[in-house]
């Protein structure tokens, strides 16, 4: 009985959180899910739409990758994702055209033929151009399992 009560309370809390999101925040979070899908499916055209031309991603080790780096890794098959999923996301909007999203990402796949399965904490900076969101910068820090 206690387990059922806990499940109900957690479900209600999760629903309240979802309902407390503004439509703009929901739009930003949907953008994040769509970006994950583009990486998962190695959708180069999709990535070209969602990443700004000057996009940068700072990795846990301090390396910085560009939009071209990300796209070339997927196009070449150097990196393949079986899982690419964001969760525990929180969107903050600053005006009508800037957003910062915090969350965690689980990625699983292969890089240079070697398997990986990791969780990272991320911070993404999004801008709205021509009526659509784009990812301008990201930073990830690996979380130990």
State where each predicted segment sits.
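Positively charged n-region of N-terminal signal peptides that target proteins for export
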Residues: 1-5
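A beta-strand edge to alpha-helix "cap/lid" segment located at domain peripheries
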Residues: 21-145
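Bacterial N-terminal signal peptides
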Residues: 7-16
């Amino acid at each position: 009985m206690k387990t059922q009560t806990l499940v109900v309370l957690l479900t209600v809390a999760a629903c309240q959180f979802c309902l407390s999101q503004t439509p703009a925040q929901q739009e930003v979070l949907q953008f994040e899910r769509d970006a994950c899908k583009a990486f998962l499916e190695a959708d180069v055209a999709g990535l070209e739409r969602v990443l700004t031309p000057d996009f940068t991603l700072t990795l846990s080790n301090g390396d910085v990758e560009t939009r071209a780096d990300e796209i070339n890794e997927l196009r070449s098959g150097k990196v393949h994702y079986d899982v690419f999923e964001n969760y525990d996301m929180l969107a903050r909007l600053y005006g009508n055209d800037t957003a910062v999203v915090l969350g965690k990402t689980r990625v699983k796949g292969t890089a240079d033929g070697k398997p990986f399965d990791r969780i990272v904490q991320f911070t993404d900076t999004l801008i709205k151009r021509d009526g659509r969101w784009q990812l301008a910068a990201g930073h990830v820090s690996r979380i130990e399992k």
